[in-house]
Amino acid sequence: SRNKIQMAAKSGFIFVNETSVKPNFKIKPKDVVKVTLPHPPFENLLKSEKIPLNVVFEDDHLIVINKEAGLVVHPGHGNYSGTLVNALLYHFKNLPVNSNERPGLVHRLDKETSGLILVAKSNLAMKSLADQFYNKTINRTYQALVWGNVQKDNGTINANIARDLKNRLKMFVYADNEIGKKAITHYKVIERFGYVTLIECNLETGRTHQIRVHMKHIGHTLFNDERYGGNIILKGTKFSKYKQFIDNCFKILPRQALHAKTIGFKHPLNQKKMVFTSDLPEDISQVLKKWRTYSKHKDFL
């Protein structure tokens, strides 16, 4: 329909000669036009699947789950099964749906991001938690290993984020804040290893790939974040076994080094403050241990 085409253009899903264009773009003879339309709602296609979940907390209104890396949160193009939503439908009945008709979900994590995710079990919880996210009263803390020696002990990144016009699978920072949605990330250094830094991030907003894009924007791409160039080895060291060391780290941690460590919110029923924390997963912990050892090598720096 005309409306769907207009929405696709506004969302950056219409490409002319491999470049995303705006609705008022005028095409010329021999231009190659490609349109990607969103799939219809998945609520009629969803099926329950017996996928194990690490449930940290559960009551009549909500669930806190420690998501493993590699688990997609909800079905989408290329991932119609094997997702967190499929698992939720198996383990929990009659979950409320959000505005996107995704059962129980009030926020999401990227596929390769591990850590805590909050799920609503009741309509009361769905509304309350959604309101808390909207009002920015939910506290979310992440830990990430990033490339480079982050000089400042702490800082704030305030820069709009929107879809990359050249690659719709990526997001991009628009520093003039004229394009995209407002995005604010607070970070602080936890530990420095010379060529990488362990940081903690607190989000004021929850944009797609926010930490990954913001850290790349300030020159500190997440370690092994392939989509944003974090799988490219930082050069400059004279340490003879440096490349071998990094390759070994990549094998241990075949994903971006990002973990949703803490989530805090008010319980929808009694308004009691609840805070949950999860340990770093084994893959990130092993890589950190290796960096602690090798960064002390006399030839490393």
Per-segment meaning from a language model:
Residues 58, 81, 135, 143, ...:
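Compositionally biased, intrinsically disordered low-complexity regions enriched in proline and serine
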